[in-house]
Amino acid sequence: MRFLRGFVFSLAFTLYKVTATAEIGSEINVENEAPPDGLSWEEWHMDHEHQLKDYTPETFFALHDIKKKGFLDENDILSLYGLNREEIVGAGDGMGQHDESEKIDNEMAKRVVSLIMRLLDVDDNTKITKEEYLQFAKRGNKFPDLGVGVGHHSDFELEYEIHHWNKFHKDKDPDVKVVHKEDIEHELLHHEHEIEHEEEIQRGASRATVITDDELESRIELKNIPEKFKNGIF
């Protein structure tokens, strides 16, 4: 994943960024997702994941203080950046091809937490209090793009519901009379993921085992795919 792509809060912070980048290293896999032009990572995250184009620092903090503790801890930061899981299935949002799936690099996740703590945890107690964050935001700062994508909070099934099902089917078309390509893409991803994990159990394979899309699709039982998702395609 591309790491530390571009967050410049000030000339001094630019110097800090260079140091941090060197410390992190270059062994991280490349992540292709990037904020749209004109948006910071934080703004991109809030728009894409929370459907909020306008928000206050108080709203941002409340949404990401998961247990309403009054501070952000390691788990909150991992959740914010979509790293609170063992693997990212497909593109992470319920879409994509199964070959795109990847395991979360635990060392990288630790470095993400460490960097964010160094930026915001003023008293160095491994907690980012609401006041610490509000002071950070008051200076015009925002959570930086660390090259790990938009920060999907949930697994690929729930992300599909959030970004597609709730928008197009939940109220308007609960019986899926209108099938979109996203519905079929997600259904295939779901079946491929199930097959891979069944194979891991049967073979005693490690989590690093990779099965190609062609192999997975050849084993999908079309009769198990609900008719509402076929729409004459299969």
Curated annotation (Swiss-Prot):
Cellular compartments per GO CC: cytoplasm; endoplasmic reticulum-Golgi intermediate compartment; fungal-type vacuole
GO molecular function: calcium ion binding
UniProt cross-references to Gene3D superfamilies, sorted A to Z: EF-hand
Modified residues (Phosphothreonine): T212
Signal peptide boundaries: 1-22
The keyword Nucleotide-binding appears for this protein: no
Keywords: Phosphoprotein, Repeat, Signal
Stored InterPro entries: EF-hand-dom_pair, EF_hand_dom, Nucleobindin
Domain EF-hand as annotated: residue spans: 52-87, 108-143
Keyword Repeat: yes
Further information: Present with 6900 molecules/cell in log phase SD medium.
Protein name: Protein SSP120
